[in-house]
Amino acid sequence: MAGCCCLSAEEKESQRISAEIERQLRRDKKDARRELKLLLLGTGESGKSTFIKQMRIIHGSGYSDEDRKGFTKLVYQNIFTAMQAMIRAMDTLRIQYVCEQNKENAQIIREVEVDKVSMLSREQVEAIKQLWQDPGIQECYDRRREYQLSDSAKYYLTDIDRIATPSFVPTQQDVLRVRVPTTGIIEYPFDLENIIFRMVDVGGQRSERRKWIHCFESVTSIIFLVALSEYDQVLAECDNENRMEESKALFKTIITYPWFLNSSVILFLNKKDLLEEKIMYSHLISYFPEYTGPKQDVRAARDFILKLYQDQNPDKEKVIYSHFTCATDTDNIRFVFAAVKDTILQLNLREFNLV
């Protein structure tokens, strides 16, 4: 009888394996719950891709020398895209070059096939430098709200000497400022305090938005980005629609979707640095007549824009968490995301057995 209680070595091993499998299954189930899905939304050029890059710098592996070298061609292409946009705008806005030689320089840049650019020739660099110094081009740059020009244009063009050196390797800031429109869906998972934050970036242009629907399952939080500086700009896809009006309408659509009833909403009012610069010469009241605050007042402008978005929320019980951000400033994003992470974890305490 006593012999029945004694397990053979094989049976003991079999039980051990079964117990291990059970433990692993429990761990897997727990791990599946320990993943947060953050959906990054917003209209085109609001800063979503830059924010993802910051997550890689702050919470991931960052950008090695080799990674940064991979952005060299894109930096060159951004420079040509910006300069060609200004050259075209010189014609449409009927601005004259002050230096006659710049008509020829403009032709040199016009002939460049941007998507085939992989280097900068000496002739091209000289043409870019002379054009950028021309008072006509500077006037054209000052009127950039009247056409489409990337926010990084001035950053790259004022630093053309550094970028044109043969040994040029893009810095972290160069990488953050590279503009490549997001097509399709980009996922970036990173681990924080044993919880996986899966950040999903989708294209913001209208043509990309129909792809969003597949991302809507089990979203923990929506992070919606607004470009504060777009209050006086029109859409790339439709030149008589105000960008901020489009963004505001999209925000209302997103927060009233049935899919997101249980998702927290975090609003990033981004590009605060550009707003501070622009509000000094482009008055908010010219584009939003309901604005009653003083001119050239950054705080009043920020508060007004925040309220515009808060007013889109029909459910007064639902809290919208808001932060003013500058997506190209790593310290700012590190600070803001620490607060966001705490908010998300607080809201999901029970799910992660933290209470």
From Swiss-Prot:
Region (G5 motif): 325-330
Recorded coiled-coil stretches: none
Pfam families found in the cross-reference section: G-alpha (PF00503)
GO molecular function: G protein-coupled receptor binding; G-protein beta/gamma-subunit complex binding; GTP binding; GTPase activity; metal ion binding
Annotated GTP binding sites: 42-49, 176-182, 201-205, 270-273, 327
Disulfide linkage: none
GO cellular component: cytoplasm; extracellular exosome; heterotrimeric G-protein complex; plasma membrane
InterPro entries for the chain: Gprotein_alpha_Q, Gprotein_alpha_su, GproteinA_insert, P-loop_NTPase
Residues engaged in binding Mg(2+): S49, T182
Stored Gene3D superfamilies: GI Alpha 1, domain 2-like, P-loop containing nucleotide triphosphate hydrolases
PANTHER family per record: GTP-BINDING PROTEIN ALPHA SUBUNIT, GUANINE NUCLEOTIDE-BINDING PROTEIN SUBUNIT ALPHA-14
Job of this protein: Guanine nucleotide-binding proteins (G proteins) are involved as modulators or transducers in various transmembrane signaling systems.
UniProt name for this protein: Guanine nucleotide-binding protein subunit alpha-14
Organism: Homo sapiens
